[in-house]
Amino acid sequence: MSAMLVVLLAAGGGSRFAGPTHKLLHVLPDGRTVSAHAIDHAVEADIGPVLVVTGAVEVPVPAGVHTLHHAGWRDGQATSLAAAIDHADQLGVSHVLLALADQPGIPAEAWRRIAGHHEAPIGPHGDEVIVVASYDGRRGPHPVRLHRSSWSLLPRTGDDGARSLIRDQAHLVREVACPGSAADIDTLEDVTRWKSS
């Protein structure tokens, strides 16, 4: 068992975005949507199968990208992540690489660096490390690489996602310097900042 599943969470309602469409469907200056940027970079990285977890809106995906509709998306990001983890468990993959579909600035190279980080298991129990991205010396943390041994420690309710695992298992976290930015698009002001970066 060694395959990696790339997961983009795209289920949330995007309630802070005041544009005419859902934030993931907002078209950026190059004609692609916010989510298309994120998905295209994940596909370009060529790490493994890509899964987009949808909910509030259906996000268009290119051929070969899988979607998983999460009907319980209103119950928080952790429930969307749990749906992805359950899917990954059924597939039998060893790792999940995770980011959000509203992060258009994470390039393929960042995905590759997180996927390619190798470190022997640590500690008396042989725990696998949790690999997170850093950008210009600041923790992203996305993409995040999670070995299946850590999946049971992830929250299954609320809005925390993988943050609580990263916080609670800090001794296992390894940062890898990456190009790009993990800034997310939550508001129209974020779009303006993204355009000027």
Name each model feature, range by range.
Residues 16, 60, 104-105:
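A short, conserved beta-strand element in the Rossmann-like catalytic core
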Residues 1-54:
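N-terminal glycine-rich phosphate-binding loop and ensuing alpha1 helix
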Residues 29, 68-73, 176-177:
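Short beta->alpha connector loops at strand-helix junctions that form conserved
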